[in-house]
Structure formats: structure tokens, C-alpha cells
Regions:
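Alpha/propeptide regions of enzymes that mature by internal proteolysis
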Residues: 1-313
Length: 313
């Protein structure tokens, strides 16, 4: 008898307002979300590991210009792309992360390599890239990541003297762009992965929660796997991912109760906006957000696919 397995993904909690979303863009986003969750689910269905499933799912999102990670990463104040990513394996609490990488096509794969092929958890900037090239990752020119849409967003914020956490005429990209995945495999192992380009017009060197284990990413067998998206500074201060795990571990709360207590309670009280995806040891999925929406998809233990954008979908 096949043991339960499931997967959930997100493409960021800062969704484009309904009135600004063209049918063409909506269909493109939904197609990318479906492709990503199916890529991960296929691995689980074949008996593969949760870690490989979440990396495969996130890689699909990194390769799309629709999301703020990899190809679609936003630009820093000095017109560069600087990306963060992390992974965690619930089996042994192994983790790997990178921050401030500029020339790596798929930072999530590099984060996994840091976990599996180094003695460290977090590598940053030039050191992370040196390690990447030693491991066989290809040098990717900044031109690959450049898109007109991201450049226009940067110019808009510059012209108005706004920085990353301010309002802009691109409300979907104010502060929430991140992608992530969580999964439970047939062996009962949990894993989580998160990747981002950060925030538009960020000061060079800024690192958000996506690179920090316990803030943007956490996974622990028998408890939960979490990937977050939102205003990174708040998620770091609140240690959101680990807070969810702690409530489930020590208070014995279910995944729904723990997630909502943090996202709708503590985080919101602090002024933090965003969301998260989580999966418990039984494969129960939960999507929590206090924003207008969150690009998301999941395939539950019954094999049912759901792909959604807005909070009230």
C-alpha cells in the first residue's frame, strides 16, 4: 500500500490586483504554478525524496519570468540581480542556503549543493559563487535575468524616491516576491525550499528571510515543513517558519491553527504582511496569508490539484 505523499508551492504573496491582471498573464501564471507543482509531485509519485521534489518545483518557478526568483528576479538599487535561496531536509535537519548570488541560474540547486557538498549551511556572495563553479554550476550573465518589466519597476521606485518596502505603482512587487515548496514523500520525510530575488530597489548586500533557516524555511520530520513569503525583515524578526514549527511541536497545535496564529496574529500585529505554505507529517497542506493573495498550488494526499491566486479564490 502506497504511503501518503503531497506537495504545495507558492509563487509569492504579493499578487497583482484583479483589475490589473490580464487574462493572458493570469493563464501564464496558472500554467507555471501547475507545471511546478506537477514537477515535484511526479518525483514523489515515483517514490522519490521530498528534498528532490521541492527543488524540482522551485526550479520551474525560477525559470519563469513571472515570479521574483531566478529569471524573474527584481533589480537592486544599482541595477543588479542578487538572489537568495535555502533548503532544509526534515530527516536530519540538514540545511543549505546562499545569499547575494548574481550569476547562478538556479540558486535553489546551489543551496542544495551547499547542504550536500560542503561543511557549511550558508554561503554568501563571491564565496557562494566560487563554490558554485567548483561544483560545476555554469556562470550566468546578468543579462539573462534582465527583463523590461523589472527595470520599469526599479525606475518607478527610483523616480518617486521610494525604496523596497514602500508603495509603488507595481503593488504586486512591493515586497512579497518569493517562491517556495514543501513536500512529504512516501518514506515520511519532509522538506522545504525557498528562493527569491529579494525586493525592488533594495540596497546592495541586503539579505532577506529566504536565505535564513528558521525564518523563511524550515523542515522537521514528524512536525512540519514551511516556506514563507512576505516582508522579509518582519519574517526574520518573528522567525516565522520556526515559530510555526514550535507551536506544533510544543503546543501540539495542528498545522492550520499554528499557521493562522502566526500569520493572522503575531506577524500582523507587528505590521508584517505576507503568507506561507506548510505541510504536516500526515501530508495535510495549509496556505496562510494576510495579503490580498498568494500565487499557490498544491496536490494533496488524494491526488487532487488546486491552483489559486487570490485570498478569496
Amino acid at each position: 500500500m502506497t504511503k501518503p505523499f503531497s506537495i504545495a508551492i507558492h509563487g509569492g504573496a504579493g499578487t497583482i490586483l484583479r483589475e490589473q491582471m490580464s487574462d493572458e498573464l493570469r493563464q501564464s501564471i496558472l500554467a507555471d504554478l501547475e507545471a511546478a507543482v506537477k514537477a515535484g509531485h511526479q518525483i514523489l509519485e515515483q517514490g522519490g525524496e521530498a528534498l528532490d521534489a521541492v527543488v524540482a518545483a522551485v526550479k520551474v518557478l525560477e525559470d519563469s519570468p513571472n515570479f521574483n526568483a531566478g529569471k524573474g528576479s527584481v533589480l537592486t538599487h544599482n541595477e543588479m540581480v542578487e538572489m537568495d535561496a535555502s533548503v532544509m531536509d526534515g530527516r536530519n535537519l540538514a540545511a543549505g542556503a546562499v545569499a547575494g548570488v548574481r550569476h547562478i541560474k538556479n540558486p535553489i540547486e546551489l543551496a542544495r549543493d551547499v547542504m550536500l557538498r560542503s561543511n557549511h549551511v550558508l554561503l554568501v556572495g563571491e564565496g557562494a559563487e566560487k563554490f558554485a563553479f567548483e561544483q560545476g554550476h555554469q556562470y550566468t550573465e546578468q543579462d539573462y535575468f534582465f527583463t523590461d518589466r523589472r527595470y520599469e519597476q526599479l525606475l518607478s521606485m527610483r523616480e518617486k524616491g521610494l525604496f523596497a518596502l514602500s508603495e509603488s505603482r507595481y503593488p504586486d512587487d512591493r515586497k512579497h516576491g518569493t517562491v517556495g515548496a514543501v513536500a512529504l514523500d512516501q518514506q515520511g520525510n519532509l522538506a522545504a525550499a525557498t528562493s527569491t530575488g529579494g525586493v525592488t530597489n533594495k540596497q546592495y548586500g541586503r539579505v532577506g528571510d529566504s536565505a535564513l533557516i528558521g525564518c523563511g524555511t524550515v523542515a522537521e520530520n514528524g512536525v512540519v515543513a514551511v516556506s514563507t513569503t512576505g516582508v522579509g525583515e518582519f519574517f526574520i524578526r518573528k522567525r516565522v517558519a520556526e515559530d510555526v514549527a514550535a507551536r506544533m511541536r510544543y503546543l501540539q497545535e495542528d498545522v492550520h491553527t499554528a499557521c493562522e496564529a502566526i500569520i493572522q496574529g503575531d506577524l500582523k500585529t507587528m505590521g508584517g504582511e505576507g503568507g506561507l505554505i506548510a505541510i504536516d507529517a500526515n501530508g495535510e497542506l495549509h496556505f496562510a496569508m494576510n495579503s490580498t493573495g498568494m500565487y499557490r498550488a498544491g496536490i494533496n494526499t488524494r491526488g487532487e490539484l488546486r491552483v489559486k491566486i487570490y485570498a478569496n479564490d
